[in-house]
C-alpha cells in the first residue's frame, strides 16, 4: 500500500510540474520528447517510436572486437532472429584515432556505415554509445593510448586540453550517426552521452551538491552532439544505484539527459565474484535485486531503463578456460530477465549479446584475449541453449504489446497456494491485460514447487489452472502467466503455459505456447466453443477441452516436440516443450522493428537458425543455418506454393492443418589440413652486444619531466607512452659505464604483466607475473666478469604490459618506475653508478600507424613484428626448419618466432568457424608468453604460467578460407629452460548457411609485407 500511495504522490507532483509543458498520456503521466523531435517519446511506462509503444529488448555488440565487416551481418541477423527489437554498440575512440591528428572512419573495419544500413535492412533500432569513454574492459576504457601521458589532463572533465582531444573523434562519430537517425528514416533512436559517469554530485547524492566540473563536461558533450546533428534523445547509464546522476526527475542541476538508466550485474560482471562485493555485497547465487523503488524515486516519469543488464561475465586472467558460463546460463536468463519485467522494466539491453575477441592490444589488464563474456552468441559465433533461452523471452516481449504499459498492482505469496512461490501482478491500465511474474519466494532457492495462481480476468477472479493439475517452478525458474492477452482479434483469457509469440496469417491467428518438457499447461480462449487436436507429439498424452462460461479451456501435458490444436473462430494454437521452442522461429516479413501484426511473421519449427524470410507472390524464401539434417515445419499464408532454403527449392508436403513440411539436408563436413612444417628464427637480437640500436625503431628515452601525475622514482622518465609506444611488448636499452653489482627495477604493466632483463647479452632473470599484481620490483645481481669496467655496458629490459587500467587508472604509467644500478663495492660506500642514457623500441613506426588496416592495436615491439615476419608475403626461405611438428620448442631465455603457411579451401554455401588450440606439452616448462598471429593479426595472447585460455577463435576474413594463410607464433621464454608449445586448430561448427563465408570479400583486410619494414630492425 505504501508503494501505491507513493506512486500517486509522484504522479500528482509530476503532473503539477510538467503538465504545462508536456502532453499527457492516458493515465496522466507526462509524455516527454526532447523538444527536437516527436519521433521518439517516452513516459513513465515505456519509449514510444512514431507514436507506438515499444518494449526495448536490446543487446550489445562491439564491431571493433570482430574486425571483419562481412561478419557484422551474421551477428546482427542472429540478434534479429532471436526477437530483439534493438541492438546497442560502443564505438571506440581508440580504434578510430591512432594518433592525435587522425580520425579514421573509412579504412577497413572502421567504416561503421554498414552497421546502420544493416539495422535498417533487418529491422532493428539502435542505441549508439559513442563515449568518448566506454570502459568495456578495453585498454584505458577505450581511450586512445596517446591520451594517457598526462598531457591532456586527468581526463573525463572540462579541461580544455582533453576537450580539444575528444572533439575531432566525437564530432565525426556524431556527424555519421546523425545521418542514420530515426528522424531521417533510419533506426538510431537514442544517443548515450559518456558512460557510467556517475559524477554529478560531489558527495552523497541526497545532499544535491553539484560537481560543476562534471556538469560542464556533460554539457560540452551534449552541445557537441546537438551541434553535429543529433536530434534523438540523449541517454545516460548510472554505474550503480548509488550514483543518482543526470536525471531531470531527480534534480534540475546541469548536464541532465533526456532518459536515464541503470546498469546492473547482479551475478557480477567478472568470473571473479569477489570483485563485485563493493557494489553488490556478498555474492549469493540467484539473488535478485529490487529495482522498482529505485526507478520510482529516481526517474518516475521515464521508462525503467537498463542500458546494460548482465548478459554474461568477462573472464579474468586466472579464470577458467571457457569462462564461467554456468553462473549466467539458462537458469539465470530465465529467472533474472523475467524478474526485470516484474520490476516494470520496459527497456533493457544485454551486455554482452556478442562479446568477440580482445585481439591485439584491445584488452584492459582485467581480462585476456577472449571476450566471449559467456554471451548468448559465443565468441566463435555459435549459438546454443543460452541464446535459445533468451529467444523465448525476447519473442514474447516483441509480441506482448500490452506489456509496454503496466502498473505494478501488488506482489507476494498471497497470489498462490504455496508459500514458497510469489507473484508480481502487472496490469495494463487501458486494456486490463495482466501479467503475473511468478518465482520462488526466495529467489536463491531452486526447489521443485507446484502451485495454483489467483488471477484477475475479464471473466472475474479465477484460480488457475481450473481443470486440476498445477503450475510448476522446477529449479531457478520464473514464469509469466498472462491474462486477457490479445492475439490478433482474439483474447487469451489466461494461460499457465508461457506465450512464445503469435502470428496473424491470412487474417487467422496462430498462437504459440510453451512449457518445460513434460510439464502441463492450461489456457482459455475467450468466446471459443470447441477445439480439436490436429497434431500431437509422439509421446504426448491426451489434450483435454472444456467449455466453461462461454470460454474454451484447453489442458495439456507437453512431452518433447510440437502439438497443434485447432479452435473454432479459425484459431490455431501451437504447443511446444522447451526443446521444440528453442528451435521455433518467427521471422518478420517487414523492416519495421515493431513488427506490426498486420504485416506479420511466418512461423518455422526445426532449424538451428532462421535468419530471415521474405514473401514474393507464392514463393517464401527462407534464409538460415542448418548443422545437420533437419525436419522443418512452416506456418505460412495459403498462397505459398514454393519454399526455398538459402536459394534452393525444398520438396514440401502439406499437412492436414495447413502447414508445409520439408527436410533440410545436412551440410558438408570439413577437414582442416594439419600443421606439418614450421620455420623458426630468433626474435630477440636486441639482447646481444653486437646489436645496433641506432635505427629508426629506437627512440631516445630522455624526458626529465612528465605531465603524468605519477612521477618516477628515477630519471629519465621511462614511461613507454611518453615516447609513442603504447602496446604490449616494449624494449628498453639502458647504458652505463664502469662496473656495477646489479640493478633494481620497479616495473608497472598491469595484471599478469612480466619482464626479463639481460646484461651485455647475458640473461639476468625475469619477473614471471601474477594475475593480481600490476607492479613488481626485482633486483638482478650481475654475475662476475659480465660488466665491462672500461667500456659501455648495455642492459636490455623486455617488458610486456597487459593494457592500461580503466576509469581513473587510465593514466597509470606503463614502463619502468625506477631503475637503479647497485654499486660494485658496498663496503667502501662507493658511489652508485648511473645510467648514461636509455633508448626504447615498440610498435614499428610508433604512432605513425604503419598498418592502417589492422590498426594501432595490432602490433607490439618484438623484433619479429617490427620487421613484419608475421605478415603474409615475408620471405622466410633462409630460416631454419623445425625438426618436429608436434611441438615448437627450444631452450634458453629468448624469443623465438615460428612461422608457417597453410592453405584452406572451404566450400561455398557454408558458415564455418575455426579456432586455434594452443598448449604446453607434458613436462615442458610453462614460464613463457606466446602470441598467435594469423595473416598479420595478433589473435591470441597465451600465457600458461598465469592464464588458462587455450582455445582462440579466429574469424574468416582474418583467416583466408580460399587461399594461403600465414601463421606465426612468437614465444618468449622467461627462463633458461626455454619453452615448448603445441599449435593446432579445429572446426567449431559447419552450417549450411545463407552467410556463405567463403564468398565474403575480405582480401583488403589482409595487406602483406613490404620492404619498408626492414628499417625497423
Curated annotation (Swiss-Prot):
Catalytic activity: Hydrolysis of terminal non-reducing beta-D-galactose residues in beta-D-galactosides
Any GO CC annotation of this UniProt entry: extracellular region
Sugar attachment sites: 23, 100, 158, 211, 411, 417, 456, 628, 681, 737, 770, 777, 785, 828-829
Swiss-Prot/TrEMBL keywords: Carbohydrate metabolism, Disulfide bond, Glycoprotein, Glycosidase, Hydrolase, Polysaccharide degradation, Secreted, Signal
Disulphide linkage map: 271-324
Localization in the cell: Secreted
Family: Belongs to the glycosyl hydrolase 35 family.
Entry protein name: Probable beta-galactosidase B
Amino acid at each position: 500500500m505504501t508503494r501505491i500511495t507513493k506512486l500517486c504522490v509522484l504522479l500528482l507532483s509530476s503532473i503539477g510540474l510538467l503538465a504545462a509543458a508536456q502532453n499527457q498520456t492516458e493515465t496522466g503521466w507526462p509524455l516527454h520528447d526532447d523538444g527536437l523531435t516527436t519521433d521518439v517519446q517516452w513516459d513513465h511506462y515505456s519509449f514510444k517510436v512514431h507514436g507506438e509503444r515499444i518494449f526495448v529488448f536490446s543487446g550489445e555488440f562491439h564491431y571493433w572486437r570482430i574486425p571483419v565487416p562481412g561478419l557484422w551481418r551474421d551477428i546482427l541477423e542472429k540478434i534479429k532472429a532471436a526477437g530483439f527489437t534493438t541492438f546497442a554498440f560502443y564505438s571506440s575512440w581508440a580504434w578510430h584515432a591512432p594518433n592525435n591528428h587522425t580520425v579514421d572512419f573509412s579504412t577497413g573495419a572502421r567504416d561503421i556505415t554498414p552497421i546502420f544500413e544493416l539495422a535498417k535492412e533487418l529491422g532493428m533500432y539502435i542505441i549508439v554509445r559513442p563515449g568518448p569513454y566506454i570502459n568495456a574492459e578495453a585498454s584505458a576504457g577505450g581511450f586512445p593510448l596517446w591520451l594517457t601521458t598526462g598531457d591532456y589532463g586527468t581526463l573525463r572533465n572540462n579541461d580544455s586540453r582533453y576537450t580539444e582531444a575528444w572533439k575531432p573523434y566525437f564530432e565525426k562519430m556524431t556527424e555519421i550517426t546523425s545521418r542514420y537517425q530515426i528522424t531521417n528514416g533510419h533506426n538510431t533512436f537514442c544517443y548515450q552521452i559518456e558512460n557510467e559517469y556517475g559524477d554529478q554530485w560531489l558527495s552523497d547524492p541526497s545532499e544535491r551538491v553539484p560537481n560543476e566540473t562534471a556538469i560542464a563536461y556533460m554539457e560540452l558533450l551534449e552541445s557537441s552532439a546537438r551541434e553535429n546533428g543529433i536530434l534523438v534523445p540523449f541517454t545516460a547509464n548510472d554505474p550503480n544505484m548509488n550514483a543518482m546522476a543526470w536525471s531531470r526527475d531527480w534534480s534540475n542541476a546541469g548536464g541532465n539527459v533526456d532518459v536515464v538508466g541503470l546498469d546492473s550485474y547482479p551475478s557480477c560482471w567478472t568470473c571473479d565474484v569477489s570483485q563485485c562485493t563493493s557494489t553488490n555485497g556478498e555474492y549469493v547465487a540467484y539473488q535478485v535485486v529490487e529495482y522498482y523503488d529505485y526507478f520510482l524515486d529516481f526517474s518516475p516519469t521515464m521508462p525503467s531503463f537498463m542500458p546494460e543488464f548482465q548478459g554474461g561475465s568477462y573472464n579474468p586472467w586466472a579464470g577458467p578456460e571457457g569462462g564461467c558460463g554456468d553462473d549466467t546460463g539458462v537458469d539465470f536468463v530465465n529467472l533474472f530477465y523475467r524478474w526485470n519485467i516484474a520490476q516494470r522494466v520496459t527497456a533493457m539491453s544485454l551486455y554482452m549479446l556478442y562479446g568477440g575477441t580482445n585481439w591485439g592490444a584491445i584488452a584492459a589488464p582485467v581480462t585476456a584475449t577472449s571476450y566471449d563474456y559467456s554471451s548468448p552468441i559465443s565468441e566463435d559465433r555459435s549459438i546454443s541453449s543460452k541464446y535459445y533461452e533468451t529467444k523465448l523471452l525476447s519473442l514474447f516481449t516483441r509480441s506482448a504489446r500490452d506489456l509496454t504499459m503496466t502498473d505494478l498492482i501488488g506482489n507476494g505469496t498471497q497470489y498462490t497456494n504455496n508459500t514458497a512461490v510469489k507473484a508480481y501482478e502487472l496490469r495494463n491500465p487501458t486494456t486490463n491485460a495482466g501479467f503475473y511474474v511468478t518465482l520462488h519466494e526466495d529467489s536463491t532457492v531452486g526447489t521443485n514447487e507446484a502451485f495454483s495462481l489467483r488471477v484477475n480476468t475479464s471473466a472475474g477472479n479465477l484460480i488457475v489452472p481450473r481443470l486440476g493439475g498445477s503450475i510448476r517452478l522446477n529449479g531457478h525458474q520464473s514464469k509469466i502467466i498472462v491474462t486477457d492477452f490479445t492475439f490478433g482479434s482474439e483474447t487469451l483469457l489466461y494461460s499457465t503455459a508461457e506465450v512464445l509469440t503469435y502470428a496473424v496469417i491470412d487474417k487467422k491467428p496462430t498462437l504459440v505456447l510453451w512449457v518445460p518438457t513434460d510439464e502441463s499447461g492450461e489456457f482459455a480462449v475467450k468466446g471459443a466453443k470447441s477445439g480439436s487436436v490436429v497434431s500431437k507429439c509422439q509421446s504426448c498424452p491426451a489434450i483435454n477441452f472444456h467449455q466453461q462460461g462461454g470460454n474454451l479451456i484447453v489442458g495439456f501435458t507437453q512431452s518433447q516436440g510440437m502439438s497443434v490444436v485447432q479452435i473454432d473462430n479459425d484459431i490455431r494454437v501451437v504447443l511446444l516443450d522447451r526443446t521444440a521452442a528453442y528451435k521455433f522461429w518467427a521471422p518478420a516479413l517487414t523492416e519495421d522493428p515493431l513488427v506490426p501484426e498486420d504485416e506479420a511473421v511466418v512461423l518455422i519449427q526445426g532449424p538451428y537458425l532462421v535468419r530471415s524470410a521474405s514473401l514474393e507472390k507464392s514463393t517464401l524464401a527462407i534464409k538460415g543455418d542448418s548443422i545437420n539434417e533437419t525436419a522443418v515445419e512452416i506456418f505460412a499464408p495459403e498462397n505459398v506454393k514454393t519454399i526455398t532454403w538459402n536459394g534452393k527449392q525444398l520438396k514440401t508436403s502439406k499437412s492436414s492443418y495447413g502447414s508445409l513440411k520439408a527436410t533440410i539436408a545436412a551440410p558438408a563436413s570439413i577437414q582442416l589440413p594439419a600443421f606439418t612444417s614450421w620455420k623458426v628464427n630468433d626474435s630477440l637480437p636486441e639482447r646481444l652486444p653486437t646489436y645496433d640500436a641506432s635505427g629508426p625503431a629506437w627512440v631516445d628515452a630522455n624526458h626529465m619531466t612528465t605531465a603524468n601525475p605519477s612521477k618516477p622514482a628515477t630519471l629519465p622518465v621511462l614511461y613507454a607512452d611518453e615516447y609513442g609506444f603504447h602496446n604490449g611488448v616494449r624494449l628498453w636499452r639502458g647504458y652505463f659505464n664502469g662496473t656495477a653489482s646489479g640493478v633494481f627495477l620497479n616495473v608497472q604493466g598491469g595484471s599478469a604483466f612480466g619482464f626479463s632483463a639481460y646484461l651485455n647479452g647475458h640473461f639476468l632473470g625475469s619477473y614471471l607475473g601474477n594475475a593480481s599484481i600490476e607492479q613488481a620490483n626485482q633486483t638482478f645481481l650481475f654475475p662476475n666478469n659480465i660488466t665491462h669496467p672500461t667500456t659501455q655496458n648495455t642492459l636490455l629490459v623486455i617488458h610486456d604490459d597487459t593494457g592500461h587500467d580503466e576509469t581513473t587508472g587510465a593514466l597509470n604509467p606503463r614502463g619502468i618506475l625506477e631503475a637503479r644500478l647497485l654499486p660494485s663495492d658496498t663496503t667502501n660506500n662507493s658511489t652508485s653508478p648511473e645510467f648514461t642514457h636509455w633508448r626504447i623500441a615498440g610498435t614499428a613506426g610508433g604512432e605513425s600507424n604503419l598498418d592502417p588496416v589492422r590498426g594501432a592495436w595490432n602490433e607490439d615491439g618484438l623484433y619479429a613484428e617490427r620487421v613484419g615476419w608475421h605478415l603474409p608475403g615475408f620471405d622466410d626461405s633462409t630460416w631454419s626448419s623445425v625438426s618436429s611438428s608436434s611441438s615448437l620448442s627450444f631452450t634458453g631465455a629468448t624469443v623465438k618466432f615460428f612461422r608457417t603457411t597453410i592453405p584452406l579451401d572451404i566450400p561455398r554455401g557454408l558458415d564455418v568457424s575455426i579456432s586455434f588450440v594452443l598448449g604446453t606439452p607434458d613436462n615442458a616448462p610453462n614460464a613463457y608468453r606466446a602470441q598467435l598471429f594469423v595473416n598479420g593479426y595478433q589473435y591470441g595472447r597465451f600465457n600458461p604460467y598465469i592464464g588458462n585460455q587455450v582455445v582462440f577463435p579466429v574469424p574468416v576474413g582474418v583467416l583466408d578460407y580460399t587461399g594461403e594463410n600465414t601463421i606465426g607464433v612468437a614465444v618468449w621464454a622467461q627462463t633458461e629452460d626455454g619453452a615448448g608449445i603445441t599449435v593446432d586448430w579445429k572446426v567449431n561448427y559447419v552450417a549450411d548457411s545463407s552467410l556463405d563465408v567463403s564468398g565474403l570479400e575480405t582480401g583488403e583486410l589482409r595487406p602483406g609485407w613490404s620492404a619498408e619494414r626492414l628499417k625497423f630492425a
